[in-house]
Design a protein with these regions (language model features):
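Phosphate-group recognition and catalysis centered on beta-loop-alpha active-site segments
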Residues: 1-114
Length: 114
């Protein structure tokens, strides 16, 4: 049986963050499932929703922000201060990290506009 970490170890850590991905690998998952969105300046970021409202302290659509603007928002907002501030990771950041890890990646492109 294969164990997939949905949005990383999202039951214990902020979803789709580098911390959630690292903790999922440490816990022994075989695969990480993540979601990607495209910013206004064409940077691929790891985030489930088209809007940033649910998982960050910002509002609006990912596509309306450049990555420089987007990374100011706290991707750990839902955890009420339990974790330090975390930026939304870029897909490149994830790829640079995961290339040395013993897991596969399931990537979902979540958008209704492309």
């Amino acid at each position: 049986m294969k164990v997939t970490a949905h949005r990383g170890y999202s039951g214990r850590y902020p979803e789709n963050t580098m911390l959630a991905f690292k903790k999922a690998v440490k816990a022994g998952c075989d695969e990480i499932e993540l979601d990607v969105q495209l910013t206004k300046d064409d940077v691929v970021v790891v985030l489930h929703d088209e809007r940033i409202d649910r998982t960050t302290d910002g509002t609006g659509y990912v596509r309306d922000y450049t990555y420089e603007e987007l990374k100011q928002f706290n991707a750990a907002k839902c955890w009420n201060g339990r974790y330090e501030t975390m930026a939304i990771p870029t897909f490149e950041e994830y790829c640079l990290w995961v290339k040395d890890e013993p897991v596969t990646t399931n990537i979902e492109f979540k958008t209704s506009i492309y």
